[in-house]
Amino acid sequence: MNGVLTITADDLAFDTACLALPAGEAVTIVLVNADSQPHNVTIYTDSSKGTELFAGEIIEGGETIEYEIPALEAGTFYFDCTVHPAMNGSVVVS
């Protein structure tokens, strides 16, 4: 990884269920919204969504955005689209 990870939202799904990020390094996530619905990426400590680690701006269908994710410690976290919570997965930081 060169510090940039691209994910695509299409047909109410992300193209991956697992985001692998390096521990202790800030990264850029590029969200490509190929859907007609609005989407975003939000990262939480776990699937209960108790603590938000990052909240991405919601973008409309056809748009692309770069999110600057701050450095995270090693661990397994959770991400979803706050508009469509069934669009979710794990964030593995190592």
Q: What is each stretch, according to the model?
A:
Residues 10, 28, 54-57, 82:
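Secondary-structure boundary/capping motif
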Residues 36-61:
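Histidine- and aromatic-enriched segments that form or immediately flank copper-ligand environments
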